[in-house]
């Protein structure tokens, strides 16, 4: 296909869905003469997850554009990055990566024979490469090495020298792999600019750098191999996929930090050029989208329900994962997976005298800063028909600005002057350009017609009054919940409205000093 494309056609394929490109003019000059040589590297650390389909889909684009593509399994980098891959597991994890990455590529129809696969230790331990590491270390400052790895290398209080070597090795890989360009996530940008600065100091050419955006995880933050709740593993069962997608952050009308929507944009559309939203006939039936922008617009305007979007992504994702699951269902592949990633609970003994069991430690609900709020004003969001912008008094010097997707469910006159329950220590987040400084908690029920009702504090409660969970009165809330810990998301799973219309967590009531937090009618509803 690459031979039949025009120069502009090749450039468009290479650059579509990228967040940034450094060296575009140089890329076009090379494309006039010959195929572009690109490499993508992956450190063989934690298990690859579904976000890896983003670079896989771009690799498919590169091949369609006639590029020569090398995939580097950066085993030495995995060890240098704070020993994310212990030396005794390095070989096993590299083999696992080789098998699973190849299975991913095959599942999206990429011909493996057109790719070059190589391990870092095949050339990084050579005399010439090692000498260049020393040469590079003589010109790179400690400050620049640390800065370059800040977004990629694990940050610890007392960093190891190995983490400072990491960016230099990645820069040298461009020369030793004899490529024109390196492709990676935008989190690699500082390493890429480090390479552009220091390779010429050794007499080597500056390379082109192609960067794809980082796909948000299921909880809204970056998807990460080390954070179980934020990602779907490539070997997760259909039941696990359904469970994780059900819990995924996908607020009606909110297109920012939406991992479900981002997966459609960066994986499903590039692979299939269309996406089908599955809907019941009574809600209009299935709808086929041929461009992402229309889907995003419909979701923002709440013409696409989060439940329908999740169900549609679930079906498409399971289709991609099926051949990978099949490959890893053999006894040989199961053994490789278990050996490369042994169960940590079986590897570590419980310290003498410890009473802590191996189960998941319960999160303390008192970490949530829940307060009584009073809505002082309500207005329509200027850029989103489904969102309100509210000014809420929570007992502080100034009211908080809160954005909520309640337009379809609660008339504004029913909110004005109302006492509500506000979660006050979530990290502030922009919603269609306006920063929301809290979450208004509501009960909801799914069905033919979704119903939503704000939670009601006891009558007479004052703005700013603390709301706590029964039995957890003495705990202190965190100043700001850390998104990576997903405290709210883990607790929210057990939020429910009881038969007597009380808001509860694991059967324990939400309370103020005046009594229980309630809901008007939605028995058995979820809270969020």
From Swiss-Prot:
Gene Ontology cellular component annotations, sorted alphabetically: cytoplasm; nucleus
Name residues in a coiled coil. Answer: none
- GO MF annotations, alphabetized: ATP binding; tRNA binding; tyrosine-tRNA ligase activity
Q: Which residues cross the membrane?
A: none
Amino acids binding L-tyrosine: 39, 166, 170, 173, 188
Query: Can you state which reaction this protein catalyses?
Result: tRNA(Tyr) + L-tyrosine + ATP = L-tyrosyl-tRNA(Tyr) + AMP + diphosphate + H(+)
* Keywords carried by this UniProt record: Aminoacyl-tRNA synthetase, ATP-binding, Cytoplasm, Ligase, Nucleotide-binding, Nucleus, Protein biosynthesis, RNA-binding, tRNA-binding
- Identify the EC number(s): 6.1.1.1
Enzyme class at the top of the EC tree: ligase
Task: Supply the SUPFAM superfamilies for this chain.
Answer: Nucleic acid-binding proteins, Nucleotidylyl transferase
Q: Where is this motif: 'HIGH' region?
A: 44-52
Segments carrying the region annotation (Disordered) are 332-362
One Pfam family name from the record? tRNA-synt_1b
Its annotated compartments are:
Cytoplasm; Nucleus
Gene Ontology biological-process annotations: tyrosyl-tRNA aminoacylation
What residue intervals hold the motif 'KMSKS' region? 222-226
Instruction: List each copy of the tRNA-binding domain by range.
Output: 364-468
Where the record places motif Nuclear localization signal is 242-247
Q: What does this protein do?
A: Catalyzes the attachment of tyrosine to tRNA(Tyr) in a two-step reaction: tyrosine is first activated by ATP to form Tyr-AMP and then transferred to the acceptor end of tRNA(Tyr).
**Family of the protein in this entry:** Belongs to the class-I aminoacyl-tRNA synthetase family.
Report quaternary structure and partners: Homodimer.
The record's domain comment reads: The nuclear localization signal, which mediates localization to the nucleus, is also important for interacting with tRNA(Tyr), suggesting that it is sterically blocked when tRNA(Tyr) is bound.
| Protein name, UniProt field | Tyrosine--tRNA ligase, cytoplasmic
Species, as recorded: Xenopus laevis (African clawed frog)
Q: Which gene encodes it?
A: yars1
